[in-house]
Amino acid sequence: MYHVIGTSIVVSVLYLISFIFYRTGLHSLASHRRLWNSILAITFIITALAGLFMALQINFKWDIPGIKTILKWHVETGAGMAITGIFHLIWHLSYFRQIFKRVTAPSGITEFSKMSPYDISINLFIIGFTSMSVQILLMREIMNISGGFELTTGIFLGSWLITSGIGAYAAGRSGMNDVRRINLMFSVSPLVSVVLLILLSRLFLETGETPSFLVSMIFTFLVLLPFCVISGFSFVKLIATARSGSDFIPGKSFSIETIGGIVAGILLSILTAGLLNTYQILLTIILMSLAFTLLNFFVSGRNLKLFIKILTAILAAIILFSGPDTFFRHLLLPGIRVTATKDTPYGNITYGEYSGEKSVYYNQRLLKYSDDAAEREENIHYALLQKKNPEKVLLISGSLKSHLPEILKYPVKTVYYIERDPEIVKSESLQVDSVKVKLIIENRDAFRYLKVNGEKFDAVILLLPPPSTLSMNRYYTTEFFKNVKKRLNPDGIFMCSPGIWDNYPNRESLNFFSSIYNSLTAVFKNVKPVAGNKLYFISSDSEISVSICQLTEERNIHNIYVSYDFLADDLIANKSAQVISLLDPSARKNSSLFPIASFHFQSYNLSRDLSEKIPSIIFMVIVFALPVLTVRRKNLLMYCSASALAGFEIIILLTLQLTVGNMYQFTGIILAALMAGLAVGAGINIRFLNALNLKLKAMFLAGYYIIIALITSFLLSVNSIPAAITIILLSVLFPSFITGHIFREITITDKDGSRSAVTYSSDLAGSAFGFMVISGVAIPLIGLKVSIFLLSGLIFAGILLGTTTDK
């Protein structure tokens, strides 16, 4: 399928954004021309080479590998650049007429606006508050759309930081210093990103579709581009304005902006805990930011200001009480009549109808629907058929309303249901009083529940999604399986379903399933795979039978799908034996310290479309790795320190989940503590630190990471929630403080904002690299402890390469 219209529209919109950046002064006309002349040249070469390969194949009957991929790129790049080329030619006819003439471009430099210290402080705070708010809310939406895999999370954070760094770098080279215009662009830019999010979703994604990794990267980068570029540009220009007019050192400006981000993080932790929905908050924040800009920079009359305030209050009330999220969910789920939607700390639940059939979507994907007999029966009966008389069953996640009738086909007396998101339980519309057995519903983290709870069960059934993230990976580790076994009766049954089994599994798929299978065999004496709609691993210390149909007859269980009508025991047994023969017994076991299954799952996703694998890797290298080549030597320490802190942030959040569980509110507090450390380090002059040189401070930071690595096992062994949270909270303060102080020391002599621009862009580029490498590669491949040692290695690299003068 060729996205001719979609590609043309998207590229044209990007060209329009670049042109608006030129018209508003973010970059020069020469930069705009160079950028798009280069893009047009590159795409022309790609299109021409693709056409040449196709001509060779047709004329000489050559068998060129990947010709279909070449054809796709030939059509996509040709269609995308055709319209843009026309626009570019029209806008720059004079440029092509005078291409051989020497033209001196006007400087376009304007004086910095004069602002009082109070006004510039408020402006910096608003920039920080709005930027952090939009970041959190857009991240929720993009993670919902893209599937929320670890790499896509890193892609979002990396794209956010890289595009902000582009804006910061552009600010250092731009002569546009009009704070009024800068604030107006900043206030409008989040709305542009929201429009792009809706437009790209409608053009390239089907309802409920999880995009490929390459599509997720491009989608995320394009959505964030308008807001983040202007956000980075605005912050650096305000730093320069504060320095010239109020004599603020860059570190103080950075501190004030960070405080705005802290307040936003804490406030959103409260509002997104079920009080308001995403688009209610996002539109309100955009409205307030625009009102601030109008009232402070464009409106002077008292009556007119009063009118703007009243109008803003009315519009905010309309947004908060009208429920705009239903409209936006309808746009994101075309073809579905959305009847209601609810955001929770853990995701989004949307209720809809299609041709009169009601369905429930969780994070844009179908959660419950009618006639799901095959799925619900496999999820329950493969496990419970192994027991003659199961009396106590633990069901972890999944649809309770759908699965409970299947459980009640057995002589069960007590059913425990663990689901972290209480809104999912509410969406079931289940009358607990009408259930004939004892039903206990717990809205708790299943990892911690099995770790501390003393109940014993005859069967534990895990229906959570695959280990696509480090958070989900916890439920497929040897540690979790050991906790499950402790909660099982001597002949108890445990079953999980890590993912879908392909008829022709590739190496990445086998590596993924092997790591989980080996983790189970290290804990249970018997583990049997059953390949149904998903691959189910049935585990027990007792004998396990895969004669499923025979067991349904013996237990007198009447099913629609799991029965002789649809299944055959000999085929199930043969398939089970085939799966075991393909799995690698030498594959590394999945554990909390080595979450290798998460890495294999992401590798498997990348391998599902081979035509996108190489472009995906090239895109990641260009966007997240190559920016280090643009970092000046004097800023390499800032780059490496920011990269290490970003990686440490990921590690600390994973440690929180492994010790305390998935506790959303504490996550916000820890991030606020990290930002507070940055703010204090960058904004406060601590005299005794001034006597120490930069290299020594960085050595302290590297040593701190080494100490944390050495006590990692102790941190993971802490069972007390208050003690674990306190230790984790305190652990982020020192590295964030020192990293903020490094920014302060590097930029303290900056007079015109140019040094701050390149240092800030280095900070952002380093953070992007750290998020990507640590979360997506290092932790799964080399483990938690070695990854922390790697952070100290990054600091030492910054010391060796970045604390000497340029030659």
Regions found by a protein language model. Name each.
Residues 1-117:
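Membrane-embedded alpha-helical bundles that constitute the cytochrome b-like, heme-associated redox core
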Residues 104-807:
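Alpha-helical transmembrane segments of multi-pass membrane proteins
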